[in-house]
Amino acid sequence: MSTTPKHAYRRILLKLSGEALMGEEGFGIDPKVLERMAQEIKELVELGIEVGLVIGGGNLFRGEGLAKAGMNRVVGDHMGMLATVMNGLAMRDALHRAFVNARLMSAIPLNGVCDAYNWAEAISLLKSGRVVIFAAGTGNPFFTTDSAACLRGIEIEADAVLKGTKVDGVYDSDPAKNPDAVLYKKLSYSEVLDKELKVMDLAAFTLARDHNIPIRVFNMNTPGCLRAVVLGEDVGTVICHPEKQDN
């Protein structure tokens, strides 16, 4: 008799911010945080969940300041894409050290470093139980890694985009500034837009809405929270169409 717990998702797209990899550091990658995240992803693989992963690059490069100083936006975005590849390489290595088979695919070709993104191959790898890390965003400037996460989530037919953040979900105001901020448990796409809640940028959010892919926002810094999300526990905030909120 199987003792494997039932889970809410078959295939997910996990979005992690680059800042999450910094831990207590002010820059770069905290090895302890990287190892913990790899172990949490390993738990999902052992549950039989297919995992696609997008990591931001903000821990290594932020283009806003340089853009204000006159740097061309396209150049800055290309540098940001390369930062996500660096994070992807670090995560792939951490997963391999945790005995998890992982592949890194980049939206911009980097022969000898990682694989070029290929939709059909990504699907095949996911079905075979490999973690697939999608790097370099969409491969185009002016699009965020949140947009890349939603795009890849739609392409691989993920059941949801799970966005790991530094807070417990979506609040009615900034919990760092307002101790009385209220955490939402469920929201519709239209409620997020009407209330002007900051979940992700508008291009990414409307992409998810138009393709009816749920978004789950949770605290990646809480150990075990990712596992709780995929097991269907009531943690974080789920955003979807109203008819799906009772499912």
Swiss-Prot record:
Organism domain of life = Bacteria
- Enzyme class, spelled out: transferase
Q: Which GO terms describe its molecular function?
A: ATP binding; UMP kinase activity
Give yes or no: UniProt keyword Glycosyltransferase: no
Question: Transcription: present as a keyword of the record?
Answer: no
Ligand binding (UMP): G57, D77, T138, G139, N140, P141, F142, F143, T144, T145
Q: How is its activity regulated?
A: Allosterically activated by GTP. Inhibited by UTP.
Renumbered residue ranges of the record's region Involved in allosteric activation by GTP: 23-28
Q: Name one GO biological process term.
A: UDP biosynthetic process
Q: Which reaction does it catalyse?
A: UMP + ATP = UDP + ADP
Designated name of the protein: Uridylate kinase
